[in-house]
Amino acid sequence: MWRDDLPRFQPSHCRPLTVFTRPLARLIEQFERLPGIGPRTAQRLALHLLRQPEEQSRAFADALLAARQQVGQCQRCGHLSADPICDICRNPERNIGVICVVADSRDLLALERTREFSGSYHVLGGLISPMDGIGPEALGIQPLLQRLDPEQVEEVILALTPSVEGDTTSLYLARLLKPFCRVTRIAYGLPVGSELEYADDVTLARALEGRRIVE
């Protein structure tokens, strides 16, 4: 039964008070900067770390700093590597005559999971996007061209996302590469605008197998 003598709460139009101390709020803010991490997930991650023993938190921080300081780019293909030349480029069993071009290392790792490609890679570091001020000169295109003759490249596979930026980059590269080698592009088994890293292994394997020559 409702009692009229009890105080009633009115909707507050005031800005809510900060519920986290500043150090915790800063940690949450940093997690929110990560791709795919929303406010709630950021809070869960931050609170989880604080509940762990201090040595685990230190190990996490040390691993993060070590990766940031020691991991760079392969001088040949642009993939992430702790050495001047990455493991893939050093592998004598890889076919250096076939280069698969990807936008970034996440796409490379997705293709490697399929175990269907035994050639080499080249990481552009992005896609041509005039709207974002990213032109061809900002990408690793020149190093790709420099690999064609020394490595006797016979085919370049364009494994770029089916998007406006991916199509623009593919057309630009095809025009540059076709005088020197065969240029193919992975089949469109991927939804338009989708990212390669989110595609399942079977879809990626079929996209590689069904690649087509760029006219």
Swiss-Prot record:
Keyword vocabulary terms for this entry: DNA damage, DNA recombination, DNA repair, Metal-binding, Zinc, Zinc-finger
Which SUPFAM superfamilies does this UniProt record tie to the protein?
Recombination protein RecR
One function term, GO molecular function aspect: DNA binding
Report the protein's function.
Answer: May play a role in DNA repair. It seems to be involved in an RecBC-independent recombinational process of DNA repair. It may act with RecF and RecO.
The molecule here is called Recombination protein RecR
Q: Which cysteine pairs make disulfide bonds?
A: none
What SMART domains does the entry give? TOPRIM (SM00493)
Where in the chain are the C4-type zinc fingers?
74-89
Entry's family note: Belongs to the RecR family.
Superkingdom of source: Bacteria
- Any single GO BP term: DNA repair
- List each copy of the Toprim domain by range: 97-191
